[in-house]
Regions:
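Acidic-enriched and Gly/Ser
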Residues: 2-127, 145-146, 155-178
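Short beta-strand-centered aromatic/proline hotspots
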Residues: 140-148
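Glycine-centered loop/turn positions within well-structured domains
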Residues: 152
Length: 178
């Protein structure tokens, strides 16, 4: 039986190879016709050289790329087509880490809208109540409420991979009842 369900997988790349891996996967889609998409969260950084400024696009999380594919296609990318990378493991199931679609959609939405306003932290902030943003540009995003230095943040977790937080006024939040 061939599995047709597509999942988001978190993969690690070799040092400073994120863009090369993304380009290689995109080329495989065109040349080989495999149905795989990838997402590399990026941000623009302005660095000061001696007498000029240089604008460059860098990955938000070093060595991390997200791949949307079936389990078989995800394995084929590295085993058959030779793309360099390693899938992150889910320690509870001892299989490839699958990122839930809702978490991935929320993360991609926040990163596409305002990548400079997102703080990343592998150590979780103070965990609080589950909330949804009901107003503003982040409307519809679900996460957990956290406060740090009297500022309110909504923490978006991609379990086992990373934690992102966005600054949101408390009046824009609504508690989710479990």
């Amino acid at each position: 039986m061939v599995e047709t369900q597509k999942y988001w997988f978190a993969a690690r790349t070799l040092s400073k190879q994120e863009f090369a891996v993304k380009k290689r996967i995109e080329n495989l889609n065109l040349e080989e016709g495999i149905d795989v998409e990838c997402y590399l969260p990026t941000r623009t950084v302005i660095s000061q050289l001696k007498y000029r400024r240089k604008r460059s696009v860098v990955p938000v999380a070093r060595g991390l790329i997200f791949i949307h594919a079936t389990k078989q296609s995800a394995c084929d990318i590295h085993n058959v087509y030779g793309v360099q990378g390693f899938y992150m493991k889910d320690f509870s199931t001892h299989s490839m880490l699958v990122v839930p679609d809702k978490q991935m959609q929320d993360f991609m939405f926040v990163m596409d809208l305002n990548p400079e306003g997102v703080c990343f932290d592998n150590e979780p902030l103070t965990v609080g109540k589950k909330v949804t943003v009901v107003k503003g540009e982040f409307s519809g995003i679900e996460g957990e409420i956290a406060t740090e230095a009297n500022k309110t943040y909504v923490v978006i977790r991609i379990t086992g991979v990373l934690v992102a937080s966005i600054k949101v006024p408390k009046t824009y939040l609504k508690a989710i009842n479990d």
